[in-house]
Amino acid sequence: MQKIDKTLEEWRAMLDPEQYQVCRLKGTERPFTGKYNSEKRAGTYHCICCDLPLFDSNTKFDSGCGWPSFYAPIEDSAMIETRDTSHGMIRTEVTCAQCDAHLGHVFPDGPPPTGLRYCINSVCLDFKPRDGA
């Protein structure tokens, strides 16, 4: 995987303001407002910044948290996990391994088979439906 390295100014020029705030400045969209929170079609979720495939719809589940939730990425190598102690909490941040976009966080309270919940901001994703979906 080839790493993508752009300046913040380059990212700002290619992303809309909300995408830039969340993906590049580690913001968070408000719960239950993201366009993919209730998405049910079959397909693949890609990084909005670099188009790397991140999640398959087969691993998406309704966690009730207000953000799209998945129990596993397509490939473990697509994500980088980092300890996040911001906002007085201890969490694990997940970023895109190809472009370092902030995606969300992973928590150990998901369903089988992994027991993980990848809580991802919709604004960081680009959904590509499977043919016929």
From Swiss-Prot:
Homology family: Belongs to the MsrB Met sulfoxide reductase family.
The keyword Oxidoreductase is annotated on this UniProt entry: yes
Cofactor note: Binds 1 zinc ion per subunit. The zinc ion is important for the structural integrity of the protein.
Keyword entries, A-Z: Metal-binding, Oxidoreductase, Zinc
Domain of life: Bacteria
Pfam families documented for this protein: SelR (PF01641)
One cellular-component annotation, GO: cytoplasm
InterPro entries assigned to the protein according to its UniProt record, in alphabetical order: Met_Sox_Rdtase_MsrB, Met_Sox_Rdtase_MsrB_dom, Mss4-like_sf
UniProt protein name: Peptide methionine sulfoxide reductase MsrB
SUPFAM superfamilies attached to this UniProt entry: Mss4-like
Top-level class of the enzyme under EC nomenclature: oxidoreductase
Catalytic activity: L-methionyl-[protein] + [thioredoxin]-disulfide + H2O = L-methionyl-(R)-S-oxide-[protein] + [thioredoxin]-dithiol
GO MF term set: peptide-methionine (R)-S-oxide reductase activity; zinc ion binding
GO biological process: one example: response to oxidative stress
Enzyme Commission number(s) of this protein: 1.8.4.12
Alphabetical list of HAMAP family matching this protein: MsrB (MF_01400)
Catalytic residues (UniProt): C119
Residues the record lists as binding Zn(2+): C47, C50, C96, C99
Cofactors: Zn(2+)
Domain MsrB: 8-130
Cysteines joined through disulfide linkages: none
